[in-house]
Amino acid sequence: MNVMENLEQHTPMMRQYLALKAENPDILLFYRMGDFYELFYDDAKKAAALLDISLTKRGQSAGQPIPMAGVPYHAVEGYLAKLVQLGESVAICEQIGDPALSKGPVERKIVRIVTPGTVSDENLLPERQDNLIVAVYQEKDKFGLATLDMTSGRFQISEPENAESLKAELQRLAPAELLYCEDFADMQLIEHYKGLRRRPIWEFELSTAVQLLNRQFGTKDLRGFGVEKAILGLCAAGCLLQYAKETQRTALPHIQSITLIQNNENIQLDAATRRNLELTQNLAGGTENTLASVLDKCVTPMGSRLLKRWIHQPIRHIQKLRQRQQIISEIIQLDLIGELQPYLQQVGDMERILARVALRTARPRDLTRLRTALEQIPTIKDILKNSPKFTALFQQIGDFDELFALLQQAIIDNPPLLIRDGGVIAEGYNAELDEWRALSDGATKYLEDLEIRERESTGIDTLKVGFNAVHGYYIQISQGQAHKAPIHYVRRQTLKNAERFIIPELKTYEDKVLKAKGASLALEKQLYDALFDRLLPHLGALQLASLTLSALDVLTNLAERAETLNYVAPDFSDEIGVKIENGRHPVVEQVLKEPFIANPVDLNQQRHLLIITGPNMGGKSTYMRQTALITLMAYIGSFVPAESALIGPIDRIFTRIGASDDLASGRSTFMVEMTEMANILHQAGANSLVLIDEIGRGTSTYDGLSLAWACAEWLAKKLRSLTLFATHYFELTVLPEQLAGTANVHLDALEHGDSIAFMHAVQDGAASKSYGLAVAALAGVPKNVVKLAKQKLANLEKLSQQSADQKLQDLRTINQNQGELNLMEEEDGKNAALEMLAQLDPDDLSPKQALAYLYQLKKLL
């Protein structure tokens, strides 16, 4: 049944509900009724299922019972948290009218919309990870992307250069909500994300976006932000800001600027690389044994979030990286880690508190925590003034003595959770409030005196004076003595064992006290709101201080990690290459019980592709990953696990390590592998670091070997990328003899009887054997199966007409006699076909001749 039809059949209250519901038909509506938020019809059914609450009925409307569910208003945050985690959005409808003055239903209004991407309440947010809302816009094969962190006001746009770059960015951002235009073409890029929101085309119009952004920032144009040429990014930003305003229903003063992220500012990491390197999430989807789990010992949540952003966006600005290194070195040399961290810990999550202040949703305890944060600043600055290396940090933190004094005077030490409960504003802050409170607080003494006086005058020893929220003040007498009540006692309530009365004097005092309590609460709320007015003019400076303190927390944390884990400062070079002496895997070395075997790597323009051979479990993947992680750590400004490291310019890091079926997209392991490899071959360049592990395993031996050979040759000759190429195809070890810039390295193992010991040390040259059967035995394959495999291996080797050496010699001969495929030039057949076409006059050919000519061309290709 469509409940919106024939509204006159519904009660006035239900008509009001349906009108409000029509404003937001696609999201749940929490409709305030007294001490509950009620949901009706389909919302009630959905909420009952999601929240595991009772589904009941509320009378009838239009002749039908109304499904209903409800949650208590004082416990609503827990229910909202669960719904937000499930990807639901909720419109909060409050009573804004006075029930005493309302003839019909109390006036109600939707005051905010809680969505997964725009929440700012700490109970609804993951503490140590960003909560982002993203908008994406597409024109043909070009994209615009806008990102907003409602909890900090950080607003950024970018223009991914292709679909693969967009995919990588979305994976990095992991948005809680994703807005897209209703005519978005490449839905396969975004359809698997939770929190998808389809938006109308007009919200992405450039003129609308520019107007909205200028109004937000109070500017005439956007040139001052350097974003005016990023047309597609601005289109996405306009939609995103419109959505933020629509959901928050209030000003957004903490969104004070917009930043354009240029693709060349950061090292580009595609989705496969982020996954394979296990930066903040392991391959199983958890957070254990990741790079972040080792590096992140930050003492503030905002520092932890910033460090994760650094990890996912390594920068290429060498001067900034050296500044970070210098600060880390200075913190270590001056022994400031233990001095700074206790004060930084007290700063807490200042970033998100400021967002709630800006949105005017900050609770009393938010303001006391902000006060505590401001209290730490003078001490932190006093520590930083010890070195000129800290000058920029010192200046950006600012001074907030006046704001600290204001909050110290205004808010008590341990306020209640909510302002509506009163008792938040400190005594002495406002004289009028103190007067109302004195009147209200004097009630206890007055009631004690009245009880003594009335008990003495009436001679009733069971007489008591009390109060409850329903009936107000009363005089209670037991049933056995109720007949002794004086004539001026007016009966107010009868209980099983007592009677309750009211007298004119008590009624007069009740009116006076209730008025005082009401006036006190109203004035306190007014004073609390006025605090926001006094804080907001300082919001920009406070946000800068918050960001600076976050960075100081990250740098102090990285100093602690460097000192604790024996890391060194890497050097940067203008020459292409990666040279690491005795590098270690930052995560694996923390997990291993025995000492980690450190290994060197030396990649440069003369030696840019290493063919890595050796047994499974020998450490090939660890060796490759540690090279990428050390490089990435250097480019976030961190010290690295090595004896020394010299890193040249890097623009991208690619990995092709491991694969599994992508069942959701109907792609086999081999298809996933080839897709990732194709992306590398299209995108990598001379400044790219490329890790390739066991390419070609998912098909037949000859197909796989051919593909692996061709990929290695393309990387070595055409792309000249810095490449670590692990393989079990022993045939590839002849490549260094034929390709300049290519070398063999291997990880060895020792066999003793049926046992095997992995050396984990990288050595020059190719491996002598694969040790596959020894690894199988180590894995627990039954001994008889391994024994049978050894027999089969011996038979196969005897049946082989050529020795391994002869096969390798044949490979060399084939390449020498036939010549290598020139990957940089057009094939001869294609050139001949083009020459024939150039000489052809199509008008001179009959249909039969044309068909014959087509066959000739086909033979040439």
Curated annotation (Swiss-Prot):
<dbReference type="Pfam" id="PF05192">
    <property type="entry name" value="MutS_III"/>
</dbReference>
<comment type="function">
    <text>This protein is involved in the repair of mismatches in DNA. It is possible that it carries out the mismatch recognition step. This protein has a weak ATPase activity.</text>
</comment>
<feature type="binding site">
    <location>
        <begin position="614"/>
        <end position="621"/>
    </location>
    <ligand>
        <name>ATP</name>
    </ligand>
</feature>
<dbReference type="Pfam" id="PF05190">
    <property type="entry name" value="MutS_IV"/>
</dbReference>
<keyword id="KW-0547">Nucleotide-binding</keyword>
<dbReference type="Pfam" id="PF01624">
    <property type="entry name" value="MutS_I"/>
</dbReference>
<keyword id="KW-0238">DNA-binding</keyword>
<keyword id="KW-0067">ATP-binding</keyword>
<dbReference type="InterPro" id="IPR036187">
    <property type="entry name" value="DNA_mismatch_repair_MutS_sf"/>
</dbReference>
<dbReference type="InterPro" id="IPR045076">
    <property type="entry name" value="MutS"/>
</dbReference>
<dbReference type="InterPro" id="IPR000432">
    <property type="entry name" value="DNA_mismatch_repair_MutS_C"/>
</dbReference>
<dbReference type="InterPro" id="IPR005748">
    <property type="entry name" value="DNA_mismatch_repair_MutS"/>
</dbReference>
<dbReference type="Pfam" id="PF05188">
    <property type="entry name" value="MutS_II"/>
</dbReference>
<dbReference type="InterPro" id="IPR007860">
    <property type="entry name" value="DNA_mmatch_repair_MutS_con_dom"/>
</dbReference>
<dbReference type="InterPro" id="IPR007695">
    <property type="entry name" value="DNA_mismatch_repair_MutS-lik_N"/>
</dbReference>
<protein>
    <recommendedName>
        <fullName>DNA mismatch repair protein MutS</fullName>
    </recommendedName>
</protein>
<dbReference type="GO" id="GO:0003684">
    <property type="term" value="F:damaged DNA binding"/>
</dbReference>
<dbReference type="GO" id="GO:0005524">
    <property type="term" value="F:ATP binding"/>
</dbReference>
<dbReference type="InterPro" id="IPR007696">
    <property type="entry name" value="DNA_mismatch_repair_MutS_core"/>
</dbReference>
<dbReference type="GO" id="GO:0005829">
    <property type="term" value="C:cytosol"/>
</dbReference>
<keyword id="KW-0227">DNA damage</keyword>
<keyword id="KW-0234">DNA repair</keyword>
<dbReference type="InterPro" id="IPR016151">
    <property type="entry name" value="DNA_mismatch_repair_MutS_N"/>
</dbReference>
<dbReference type="Pfam" id="PF00488">
    <property type="entry name" value="MutS_V"/>
</dbReference>
<dbReference type="InterPro" id="IPR007861">
    <property type="entry name" value="DNA_mismatch_repair_MutS_clamp"/>
</dbReference>
<dbReference type="InterPro" id="IPR017261">
    <property type="entry name" value="DNA_mismatch_repair_MutS/MSH"/>
</dbReference>
<dbReference type="GO" id="GO:0006298">
    <property type="term" value="P:mismatch repair"/>
</dbReference>
<dbReference type="InterPro" id="IPR036678">
    <property type="entry name" value="MutS_con_dom_sf"/>
</dbReference>
<dbReference type="GO" id="GO:0140664">
    <property type="term" value="F:ATP-dependent DNA damage sensor activity"/>
</dbReference>
<comment type="similarity">
    <text>Belongs to the DNA mismatch repair MutS family.</text>
</comment>
<dbReference type="GO" id="GO:0030983">
    <property type="term" value="F:mismatched DNA binding"/>
</dbReference>
<dbReference type="InterPro" id="IPR027417">
    <property type="entry name" value="P-loop_NTPase"/>
</dbReference>
